[in-house]
Amino acid sequence: MQTIIDAWFVQGMIKATSDAWLKGWDERNGGNLTLRLDEADIEPYAADFHAKPRYIALSQPMPTLANQPFIVTGSGKFFRNVQLDPAANLGVVKVDSDGAGYHILWGLTEDAVPTSELPAHFLSHSERIKLTGGKDRVIMHCHATNLIALTYVLENHSDLFTRKLWEGSTECLVVFPDGVGILPWMVPGTDEIGQATAETMQKHSLVLWPFHGVFGSGPTLDETFGLIDTAEKSAEVLVKVLSMGGMKQTITRDELIALGKRFNVQPLQSALDLYP
């Protein structure tokens, strides 16, 4: 008989967190990951739920997420340990009927709680649900090394970061034509950075936190991981190019436009118009 550990969403979280740790993006308890589920996903595993689910109030109501279940990583938990003990490091939670709080249905044992970045995740989920008609289900935050490095040497401007990442690898414009948003430095784990991230997610599926990390949104764990992985690969190329004296030639504006036409995507116009 299968248990909730065998469920696709638990196995998917195990793989995503393990892969992210192996990439070097999630040292210690760095990074967090949430996946929005349907009632039909969790209903077969009701026998595994806690007998008395703990209730935790949200710092602000999230009516868009009312009655929605999620699987989330825990606060202070190490991604490298998720595969060793999923129930201690992950949790299935369900937002209540008015969006005021949530019950921990499974996991997060020994009084553990969801990630401290839950406000940023839930606010971003709310915005991406509206923007994508419910298609986006994943929010991933990690400390992608080369993306962080670039925030120290490039002007922290959305159009510039977008253009440079598009130029760093041909596939980038196809994978994130909506570009990369970037915030000012802010204290993590607060409603303020959560709100700013969510507002930026109205325009971009990738949001950089300077000197800290990146947020990504997508329809599946694979798509969201791949989104960040693609941007991080381009950032790695750019770090190497900058260390070798900078670009001598690159993909031009006209070539980027041609690329968008070939793959039927609409590139962020302000990034295209930044320079020839």
Curated annotation (Swiss-Prot):
Where does the UniProt entry say this protein principally localizes?
cytoplasm
Q: Which cofactor does it need?
A: Zn(2+)
| Residues given in the record as Zn(2+) binding sites | H141, H143, H212
**Catalytic machinery residues:** E117
| Pathway membership | Carbohydrate degradation; L-rhamnose degradation; glycerone phosphate from L-rhamnose: step 3/3
The cross-references to Gene3D superfamilies, in alphabetical order and at most eight, read: Class II aldolase/adducin N-terminal domain
Q: Could you tell me what the cofactor note in this record states?
A: Binds 1 zinc ion per subunit.
Instruction: Give GO BP annotations, semicolon-separated.
Output: pentose catabolic process; rhamnose catabolic process
Enumerate the GO terms in the molecular function aspect.
metal ion binding; rhamnulose-1-phosphate aldolase activity
What EC number(s) does this enzyme carry? 4.1.2.19
UniProt function note: Catalyzes the reversible cleavage of L-rhamnulose-1-phosphate to dihydroxyacetone phosphate (DHAP) and L-lactaldehyde.
Recorded hits in HAMAP family, A to Z, give:
RhaD (MF_00770)
Q: What is this protein called in UniProt?
A: Rhamnulose-1-phosphate aldolase
What is the native source organism of this protein?
A: Klebsiella pneumoniae subsp. pneumoniae (strain ATCC 700721 / MGH 78578)
